[in-house]
Amino acid sequence: MSKEVNEERAPRTVTDVKEMLTKHSNGEIQRTIQNCITILQNDHVLADAIRLNLLSERIDIVKPVGWPRSGKTLNDTDMKYILRRMEKYGISSEKKIESAIRIVANENRYHPIRDYLNSLKWDGTERIAHVLHHFLGAVEDEYTCEAMKIFLLGAIKRVFQPGCKFETMLCLVGGQGAGKSTFFRLLAVKDEWFSDDLRRLDDDNVYRKLQGHWIIEMSEMIATANAKSIEEIKSFLSKQKETYKVPYETHPADRLRQCVFAGTTNRQDFLPRDRTGNRRFIPVPVDAELAEVHILDNEEDSRAYIDQLWAEAMTIYNSGNYKLAFSPAMQETLQAHQQDFMQEDAQAGMVYAFLEDYTGDRVCSKQLYAEALGNTNIPAEWETRAICEIMNTGISRGDIQGWQAHKTAKRYPKYGVQKGWERVTSPETGAENFSEMSDAEAQQLGFPF
């Protein structure tokens, strides 16, 4: 190796770096941001140390710098050491040094998860179809394979295309000790890329809890979900960005989501009855007794398996031949699985039972509210809307047969002008109690659907 190459690779001394700085006519070093940048880029302690982490959107120190520290993120103590180092060059303006740090970090930005995923080489062995059975004892079938594939590809796309539309949550359902949470923690590769700290969605700091994480487990919220909270979770999952201000910024900025959400529960009825659909939640039952290995039996082997799992998913992602949704046929399978984990719908059962014995040929939501559900008060709009969902969903699914929504509003003896439902083949009796109403009259009134 030549002497010139050796000299180029030798660390620059403080004297060497001083020679690179701009000076006043009297030889004094100028206290400029550019000189600060030159020092940060060439001082042998600080060179290549300061980088902007595009996942956490924080500045990291990525190499040893000669003082005790824990973690990668630049902190106040690090700043004191850097200020002391800069004094060797006669520069002590904290404001200019901080500005230079931000510029240098931005010019040396990196994304740790992208770097990890791009470094993987797939060995050609398929694991996506088997991983949930291998570690958790899930059934090996097309549904389980597609559920895992969609989740993995969604996680990859969120990293390479932050803010992309992905509102699906993979939910693992099984007894305690099955390793569900551990699976998601290891799937995130590094512990700092995983979080299970998202307890509430109405917390002012909820969005900060997403920052720097790739896979976020929502076990507690899923375990205690009810009809209201599940709507909040669905709305939360559908978001593609958060807008907030970090401490060093003057104005709030859009933060595109780079994370995906996972659910774990041992409740067999964790999905509230949702007549508008639970398409965002993909439940997969697991059984630890059927697993080939427990994920922590040999953590090193498990992590190597997961590396290859991501490598396989990256091969699919790079091919571009994928969709982040089930096929129409598989969507039916998903709905069947969701039914297995839904809570009992008491109101729907009462409406169905009422219709079985009802002899009239027409019915409206207010009538069902009073006569099927036994209420005596006037229903709120959301209550009539819920009854409409019961009827319309029941008819579309075939749970309610022989009924259809009538096209125009009709006048009911006890309940006034209402839209409602009529028998497909009406009996000869009962029709005289109702009168047709014109579309114009109906439009002048308000109806729940």
Region annotations inferred by a language model:
Residues 1-127, 142, 146, 377-382, ...:
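N-terminal nucleic-acid engagement/recognition segments and initiation subdomains in replication
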Residues 21, 40, 46, 52-55, ...:
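Generic detector of leucine side chains in alpha-helical contexts
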Residues 53, 68, 132, 261-263:
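A structural signal for short, well-ordered beta-strand segments
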Residues 79-83, 118, 134-138, 179-185, ...:
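Generic detector of short, locally flexible boundary/turn motifs and exposed helical patches
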Residues 88-111, 165, 192-198, 202-237, ...:
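Feature primarily recognizes SF3-like P-loop helicase cores of small DNA viruses
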Residues 101-211, 366:
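P-loop NTPase catalytic core of nucleic-acid-dependent motor ATPases
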